[in-house]
């Protein structure tokens, strides 16, 4: 079983990594093409394109300028440890053992606007490029056109390496839309996490993002390997709802008292 999650806007390059293990991103030739496009933009243009403050736009223009295809521990950090934010708060990889990291390396992938698809230990230089950005490029009007079927092809390769065909979608709609389902040789399982609010269960963005990370953490820590085991997930008060679920769409509920 292979999991996919979204990246995060917040990055941490100050905290020392918990491991010396690292791998190189596999698709840097594509990333290089995007960087060359982004280098043509002024800070004001990046601000408009990405809806960023002037300060953040200037920071990211500087990042594009210093980006180099030579990735080392001195200019990059393992992706799983560099990303922060709600999903990664739930994942809490900072206490992973080496065995946890190796399991994650095989069973977890992070979707990325710049890198396409990342393994947990892939070194990553800092960037900001959300998948929904309308960056005109030689392949089309946005990043969905740029990546095309490539991400699906790479997921197929990762699944084939496992000898499996189950893809667990723990990513946002923005990012999972970069996966072309008709090109994917996999059974896709989607998951919803709903919290009680005002008398009914709803998807609340902050809680749902953290819950996706919690499920990824649980799978890694417990070495979960089959879809049949997923209904046992019970971190932080979530419980499986058989009445609301189907074989390929799992629903977990949480009461207000557990939030």
From Swiss-Prot:
HAMAP family: UPF0246. Coiled coil: none annotated. Pfam families: H2O2_YaaD. This is UPF0246 protein PST_1170. It comes from Stutzerimonas stutzeri (strain A1501) (Pseudomonas stutzeri). Belongs to the UPF0246 family. Disulfide bonds: none annotated. One of its GO terms (cellular component) is cytosol. The lineage of its organism: Bacteria, Pseudomonadati, Pseudomonadota, Gammaproteobacteria, Pseudomonadales. GO terms for biological process: response to hydroperoxide. NCBIfam families: PRK02101.1-1, PRK02101.1-3. It comes from the Bacteria.
